[in-house]
């Protein structure tokens, strides 16, 4: 690659939860230019083949355009929204939310283990479903004792397999929520969810009336203190990620708040393991979670009162043992 050429990483804003992946230039999007002279050291670990496949090198504009047409230049979207004076919108607190998410992950993996053992037995050699779950648990650093405990639990008398259910809810201010459940007692779970929604002012929605507002993605969450943003972008590009979402900032953030922010790498099912491997190779720690989330296609802005009420409703839903996750399209 010629020394005078520049390599651009196009960072397109993840606007309202929608990835604007087809836009190459826009005044509404943040553009980051990485020049070869400034990034040779950062790119030293990337092979020539990988560099060629992900970046466009050219000395003239016409050559750039030809390369854009010939190569699939991957565009990584990233946003840095500033939330002015709305500290109350930090749903359950960033650290608390991550701790809760980790606990929910362990619980869900345990449920999946129970279901797999109930259906195919405790031997992962003959039970491919269990083998897949065990691989996932290892990949996500789920403690071994949790897995072993739930393998034993599956053989207990009266223990039933777990079933996945989705419940859709309307919150305050036109906000929608999706509640993911993995339960061995459907009647118990729906009764508990309906009770919480009613008690905290929400409304149960008909099936399908909310889900279309979200999209399912594979994600990797990385604490901002664990990696430099530019480093993450290089890793994401090299591993075939689709987007990198930068966490929101608040004007009244404390140092502790800033340390509890997380980047979110969005990728496909096929590239998910590759992303994790690349992060491990680079010594970047990531948060163990199930790697699957619902992101809103658009977001709804509400006033402070509605925001607090939605926060309380979400918290109460997440306190239910059968509930694994709650997703919201609130801005």
From Swiss-Prot:
User: GO cellular component annotations, sorted alphabetically?
Assistant: chloroplast; vacuole
Q: Which InterPro entries match?
A: Integrase-like_N (IPR017856), TACO1_YebC-like_2nd/3rd_dom (IPR048300), TACO1_YebC_N (IPR049083), Transcrip_reg_TACO1-like (IPR002876), Transcrip_reg_TACO1-like_dom3 (IPR026564), YebC-like (IPR029072)
Q: Kindly give the Pfam families that the UniProt entry links to this protein.
A: TACO1_YebC_N (PF20772), Transcrip_reg (PF01709)
Q: Which domain of life is it from?
A: Eukaryota
| Family membership noted in the UniProt record | Belongs to the TACO1 family.
Q: What is this protein called?
A: Probable transcriptional regulatory protein At2g25830
């Amino acid at each position: 690659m010629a020394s005078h050429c520049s390599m651009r990483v196009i960072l397109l804003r993840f606007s309202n939860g929608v990835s604007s992946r087809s836009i190459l230039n826009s005044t509404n999007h943040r553009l980051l230019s990485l020049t070869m002279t400034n990034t040779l050291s950062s790119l030293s670990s990337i092979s020539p083949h990988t560099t060629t496949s992900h970046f466009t090198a050219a000395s003239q504009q016409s050559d750039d355009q030809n390369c854009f047409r010939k190569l699939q230049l991957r565009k990584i979207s990233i946003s840095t929204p500033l939330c002015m004076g709305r500290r109350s919108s930090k749903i359950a607190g960033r650290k608390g939310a991550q701790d809760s998410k980790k606990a929910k992950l362990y619980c869900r993996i345990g449920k999946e283990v129970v279901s797999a053992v109930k259906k195919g037995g405790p031997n992962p050699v003959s039970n491919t479903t269990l083998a897949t779950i065990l691989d996932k648990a290892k990949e996500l650093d789920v403690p071994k004792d949790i897995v072993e405990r739930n393998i034993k639990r599956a053989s207990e008398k009266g223990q039933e397999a777990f079933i996945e259910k989705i419940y859709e809810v309307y919150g305050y201010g036109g906000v929608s929520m999706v509640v993911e459940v993995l339960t061995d007692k459907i009647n118990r779970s729906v009764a508990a969810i309906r009770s919480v929604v009613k008690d905290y002012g929400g409304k149960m929605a008909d099936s399908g009336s909310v889900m279309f507002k979200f999209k399912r993605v594979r994600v990797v969450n990385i604490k901002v203190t664990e990696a430099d943003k530019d480093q993450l972008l290089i890793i994401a590009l090299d591993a075939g990620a689709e987007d990198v979402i930068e966490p929101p900032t608040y004007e009244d953030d404390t140092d502790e708040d800033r340390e509890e922010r997380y980047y979110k790498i969005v990728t496909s099912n096929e590239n998910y393991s590759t992303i994790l491997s690349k992060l491990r190779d680079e010594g970047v720690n990531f948060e163990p979670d199930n790697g699957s989330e619902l992101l809103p296609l658009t977001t709804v802005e509400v006033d402070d009162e509605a925001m607090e009420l939605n926060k309380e409703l979400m918290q109460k839903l997440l306190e239910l043992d059968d509930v694994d996750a709650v997703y919201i399209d609130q801005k």
